[in-house]
Amino acid sequence: MESPCRTITLEKNGTSLEPVHYSVQGKEILQIFKENFQKEDPVLFLDGTAGEGGHSFLFLKEFPNSRIILCDRDPIMLSRALTRLSDFSERVVSIQTNFSEINQKLLTSYGIDQTPQGILLDLGISTFHLFHSGRGFSFRESEPLDMRLNPNSGQSAEEILNIYPKDRLMNIFYTYGEERWSKKIAEVIVETRKQNSISTTFELANLVSKIIPRKFWPPGRHPATRIFQALRIEVNQELAHIENGLKLLLDLLRLGGVIQVISFHSLEDRIVKNSFRDYAKQNGFELLTKKPIFPSQEEIDENPASRSAKLRILRKTKSVDKKYRNKNFEEEEE
């Protein structure tokens, strides 16, 4: 999976800042909130994947009386987001946590006695993680195989590669990477690590490149792309966190509130799609996207990696409100 972001440079008080995350589908997401909340409303937002703070910046700027709960499992990312949002510091509460661990008890411990009205999850990995973290998310540089979004918690990719049995590795590569060469790759990894541990991105990328015949390499992508994706998902338990997190957040969402989720590959999107559909069948939830909203061609031209983004939206209401309709949402579900 490519990075759903590009690098841009901002200026503040005439001083150039380091590159920051590009907010995928920022216009569409902001428009949905504008259609559901008044500009002067004291909206409480929850950004469950703060990243560089790009989306949160848009919300705080558009809704001058709003507050935001800023969450990220990575303490470095949270710090970067807070720096970007420094002009709004009095309206920001930051919590270093995974969005799958957010509940009212946690919010109360931070002095928040209300539930959020607007929730956003951007499930893409940031430019910082890919190219600047040094944690082995990309094979463009030789880096340690870490891949932990929270560098202080859990097993690293190196530990998984050098400890997991062959069948478990094969299942990870096939299930999370949809890699047809999973069995052969797992076999070679197990044989290789008997002599030397696999510890860097280059070592893993070169190993996979030698296993998959060149005629089967995916067009325009490195042959190890799927393996890196699968490892990252396993290291961070990403799919489990999405499934569990949606349950907690949909329960937490205030009546009349809206949750928006951007996914970037089919495994993520399937969970979001099915979860939203199941909740929409219950009295009290309305699916606002019968089909996902894709980035505009203008955005794709500006940021090609955003082309894989899918935005899905759900609203919490006592009864299904048929008044809200948008031409983007009228198509039948795929």
Swiss-Prot record:
Entry's Gene3D superfamilies? Putative methyltransferase TM0872, insert domain, Vaccinia Virus protein VP39
Looking up Pfam families in the UniProt record yields:
Methyltransf_5
Instruction: Spell out the InterPro entries in the cross-references.
Output: RsmH, SAM-dep_MeTrfase_MraW_recog, SAM-dependent_MTases_sf
Q: Main location per UniProt?
A: cytoplasm
Q: Note whether S-adenosyl-L-methionine occurs among the keywords.
A: yes
Which cellular component, as a GO term, is one annotated location? cytoplasm
Annotated signal peptide: none
Q: Which residues bind S-adenosyl-L-methionine?
A: G53, G54, H55, D72, F99, D122, H129
Q: Which GO terms describe its biological process?
A: rRNA base methylation
Catalysed transformations (reactions) = cytidine(1402) in 16S rRNA + S-adenosyl-L-methionine = N(4)-methylcytidine(1402) in 16S rRNA + S-adenosyl-L-homocysteine + H(+)
Its EC top class is transferase
From which domain of life does this come? Bacteria
Enumerate the UniProt keywords alphabetically: Cytoplasm, Methyltransferase, rRNA processing, S-adenosyl-L-methionine, Transferase
Q: Where in the cell is it found?
A: Cytoplasm
**Enzyme Commission number:** 2.1.1.199
Any one GO molecular-function label of the UniProt entry: rRNA (cytosine-N4-)-methyltransferase activity
Annotated S-S bridges: none
Question: So what does this one do?
Answer: Specifically methylates the N4 position of cytidine in position 1402 (C1402) of 16S rRNA.
What does the similarity note say? Belongs to the methyltransferase superfamily. RsmH family.
| The protein, known as | Ribosomal RNA small subunit methyltransferase H
Q: Which organism is it from?
A: Leptospira interrogans serogroup Icterohaemorrhagiae serovar Lai (strain 56601)
| Chain's gene name | rsmH
